[in-house]
Amino acid sequence: MKDEVALLASVTLLGVLLQAYFSLQVISARRAFRVSPPLTTGPPEFERIYRAQVNCSEYFPLFLAMLWVAGIFFHEGAAALCGLVYLFARLRYFQGYARSAQQRLAPLYASARALWLLVALAALGLLAHFLPAELRAALLGQLRKLLLRS
């Protein structure tokens, strides 16, 4: 059992550590810009770091759910790879947003694509799971033919 989900667990741990890093950056920015809790406004430099952390936190539960569903029902390796791409894009998003609002955009789009790919893999995996075996075999046969032609 553990071997079947080790990649997913590793990506999950990496994601949690990344979230902790983002939180520590907000704490550091609070000190640097003298913004005491519970305030969430201050200099634009602080607000960008704060917003980047909040935005990343808002999407983290969606990411985790899709990572695990895609990994269990589609393919663990494919889901883990998409998860790593997502986390790297989120790190770049955070770093870009800390510099300027404009610099967050390219990594934001990259992380959105990775997340949508995880959603698609999860949906395909669940669809294949619930399809009758004969229909699933026929669809996979058609897909193989299609892939061999290209």
From Swiss-Prot:
Keywords assigned: Endoplasmic reticulum, Leukotriene biosynthesis, Lyase, Membrane, Nucleus, Phosphoprotein, Transferase, Transmembrane, Transmembrane helix
Pathway(s) the chain acts in: Lipid metabolism; leukotriene C4 biosynthesis
Database matches in SUPFAM superfamilies: MAPEG domain-like (SSF161084)
Domain of life, source organism: Eukaryota
InterPro entries listed in its UniProt record: 5_LipOase_AP, MAPEG, MAPEG-like_dom_sf, Membr-assoc_MAPEG
Active site per database record: R31, R104
Binding of glutathione, residues: R30, R51, A52, Q53, V54, N55, E58, Y59, Y93, F94, Q95, G96, Y97
Keyword tRNA-binding: no
Main subcellular location of this protein, as a coarse class: nucleus
Phosphoserine sites (modified residues): S36
Oligomeric form and interacting partners: Homotrimer. Interacts with ALOX5AP and ALOX5.
Name recorded for this polypeptide: Leukotriene C4 synthase
Organism taxonomic ancestry: Eukaryota, Metazoa, Chordata, Craniata, Vertebrata
